[in-house]
Amino acid sequence: DFTSMYVGGGTTTVLMDELAKTLELAKKLFPSIKEVSVETDPQIMGDPQIHMLEGLVDRMSIGVQSFDDGILKMTERDKFGTGQEVFENIAKAQELFPICNVDMIFGFRGQTDEILHRDLETLLKLSPRQITTYPLMVTSQTKRSVKDSIAAPHDIMAGQYRMILDMLTEDYTQLSAWAFGKSNNEGFDEYVIDNDEYLGVGSGAFSFLGDSLYVNTFSLRRYNERIGSGNNGVERRKVFGKRSILQYRLLLQLFAGRISRKYFKEVHGVDLD
């Protein structure tokens, strides 16, 4: 049985009525679902239709990135409002949902220590139940023009991360490498840490079942065609050996900041000592 549901992949609230119907159907089909988490953007919180999700969503994760107007303009997120407007919309959201998580990013070009410090002070003033602070992640596939225009030199991130830890850990418990919560039992994270298996539904979703990782097609057209013909959306499958699975579990527990010797002994028959 499923106990938790995470609706991600961007602005999942763009069709509020469809999302509400989907959540209602999921809870009807799987009554064991007790926790529902949804991703959204700040401006949605100012939409009166957001009330359609009240009572259906337990955790609303809001992608803010920064409250600094200069950073928002550089990343083209000023379309979601000014830093002050974002602040006000999150304050409204906290009245509607049991848990509000604010997603922030550090490592932007031009994001000085002073700017990051102000962002963290703003967060502490809002006092959301959860805060997630991701480093800006650029890969070899990212266009060099994008890297040069928005990414800060990599060597500044360690100092910024230390500032985040120093400012947040007095009022928050660190839940994982990036996540902080008001208590140490918040139960929600973007990353699947506490479940050995998970099922992904929809275009671009990932599943880990048994010894295999499944990837659904990212093409909406192909996904609709596959589902319409009675097939599933899986386009790729990768089978892992026992050693690789153990490495994966170990890395997830390291990411969460806790390693359970009991888990590895009872579930996998492996003695970490």
Task: Cite the ranges covered by each PLM segment.
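C-terminal scaffold of the Radical SAM
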Residues: 1-270
